[in-house]
Amino acid sequence: MQKPGQNIDFALKETSPKIGAGSVTGDKLCSTYDLVEQMHYLYVRVVKAKELPGKDVTGSCDPYVEVKLGNYRGMTKHFEKRSNPEWKQVFAFSKERIQASILEVVVKDKDVVLDDLIGRIMFDLNEIPKRVPPDSPLAPQWYRLEDRHGRKVKGELMLAVWMGTQADEAFSDAWHSDAATVGPEGVTHIRSKVYLSPKLWYVRVNVIEAQDLIPHDKTKFPEVYVKAMLGNQTLRTRISQTKTLNPMWNEDLMFVVAEPFEEALILAVEDRVAPNKDETLGRCAIPLQNVQRRLDHRPLNSRWFNLEKHIMVEGEQKEIKFASRIHLRIFLEGGYHVLDESTHYSSDLRPTAKQLWKPSIGLLEVGIISAHGLMPMKSKDGKGTTDAYCVAKYGQKWIRTRTIVDSFTPKWNEQYTWEVFDTCTVITFGAFDNGHIPGGSGKDLRIGKVRIRLSTLEADRIYTHSYPLLVFHPSGIKKTGEIQLAVRFTCLSLINMLHMYSQPLLPKMHYIHPLSVLQLDSLRHQAMNIVSARLNRAEPPLRKEIVEYMLDVDSHMWSMRRSKANFFRIMNVLSGLIAVGKWFDQICNWRNPITTILIHVLFIILVLYPELILPTVFLYLFLIGIWNFRWRPRHPPHMDTRLSHADAVHPDELDEEFDTFPTSRSSEIVRMRYDRLRSIGGRVQTVIGDLATQGERFLSLLSWRDPRATTLFVLFCLIAAIVLYVTPFQVVALLAGIYVLRHPRFRHKLPSVPLNLFRRLPARSDSLL
């Protein structure tokens, strides 16, 4: 699992948690939560009360319920002047932390100084029933209240008390004893939730033409363009080349929009009357609810829209109706996949229109078990603490675990399931510190992130590993802990899964009507902003900093470290070809005579029987694949600090990576970095120039730029054509191969004649300034 040279602290570790997969617990098979460790809870459901006696002078009461178990106390909200209140609240106490044998449920009357006791109910924990799904929920019962001496008093309380697990339906909305220090205002921020990304569409606006425009200055030809606005997205067409009152553009503008459509598309026709002054000639607003939808590449009908104009008359805005109009073709593109995350870590590749979706090929089940070794993320009461929760994103579904308060070893043991439509996708996990509970900073801090590509997983196998949580800081890479996950990919149809590998990665509209790289980058940025804004409006919100971190918003920003990492990745890819070249050089120089003789024999066989060449190549590749099967990866890939060049990054390069855009550093630092970038660019420029020179020399072979060199090459081609025509191909190939593999005794160290001729050819470098 650990790669050579990698720090063992940053390595992936295989674990053996006590999960319920395939095991029998009690009398029931744990199938719903079989990828997590089973956690037992005491549940208390407080439903309502009736006929509570009045304790005030007025004869009324302000009741609330207090559930006490040892040192833990949970309270419902209180009602004013209600003798028959309804709470419908659930309390969950972790069995691991229970240190008492009696559960006490107390009904009290809220008072200014001291709350009065109305009555209580006592439960022996040994007598409480057990309930595990798929059993039906336990029906609540009416219990008569008792005073401190055990005597029956007036009033009844409807309760349900049972021992259950985290698989219980009441678990997610319950008050938890491990969050007892969190006040009522913070409870909503610590519960587990499932979020759905908004459904995103591309909006294509084909601006065709306008008619009968009325400019203010009729003495000059108008320079007209169309400005389109949708939310905070603004795009402009080019200025029309037809300088008339009926300009034409026939230009496409692309936007991103999310359902439900809350904003209208606003189009304004503007005239460039001066370099920094534009005049609006008319505008129109188009609700997107009325826009037609396109699922394929078939053209749709265009429409004419009337333009309106508003002017100020005596301080009031008045609308002028005139005959100007604009010709548009507007539709929602359902055949594209709207990219809202980094293209390298996409978790969903389906088109927007659900009619075009293909059947799912499998299920992805994930158990978020625990974390350990977390670093203190904030200070509370003079000591470091962490309130950790986990977020996972795959497809349109986001999940957020509950927050474990004040723990460096949180145990979540929550299990989630996703449908899988393509294995060439990535699920992303992020761990965060909750900053929205008492003592928090108001911002959720990053603890670390884990990515798992589904295509690297074997079907129907459970992967249980502890993944390092790594975060970049201005001081360098820092390990903030480890997270323990259990992952299982279940294949529903092997035929469909294998057939998927023959299909295009993206929907067909991306290939029939492709979008430019600049368009895709801009649209992806807009889609990220829309998803971030929508999830930030949920309750509880999934904060903007969380969504941006999970979607890798800053993945396109310049980083010297990433550039080095990508360069060495290329060198690693080319290392195989370089090794083959070195091996061939050793063969040609007879470093190992036996191997060289065997290569001669193999070469002669292939020349005499050329029909064996392709079968031999594919058989060789087959044998390599079978041989490598013994050493196939048995664990998912993880964040590699050595590959990322994160373990030896220069402090200034790291500071540059954390710089804002535009820069916020001093002019001296920016000048130094600019000079460094110029130096690197100069070396890149030299390499590119050398490549261009070699290509231009090749083109000049027949260009007669050097008449003597071209004459020699033309004569050589004529002689070669005659020789190859009269000589069997096998003889030519055999002689050429033996010449290349000749013994060093028949070689000399000077360059060959063809190479000498090639290096003497002219290039366009002489024409550069």
Swiss-Prot record:
PROSITE patterns: C2 (PS50004)
Organism of origin: Arabidopsis thaliana (Mouse-ear cress)
Tissue expression per record: Highly expressed in roots meristems and shoot apical meristems (SAMs). Observed in flowers.
Lineage: Eukaryota, Viridiplantae, Streptophyta, Embryophyta, Tracheophyta
Residues the entry annotates as binding Ca(2+) 2: 56, 109, 111, 116
Positions contributing to Ca(2+) 1 binding: 56, 62, 109, 111
MF term (GO), any: glycosyltransferase activity
The family this protein is said to belong to: Belongs to the MCTP family.
Protein name: Multiple C2 domain and transmembrane region protein 5
Function: May function as a signaling molecule by regulating the trafficking of other regulators.
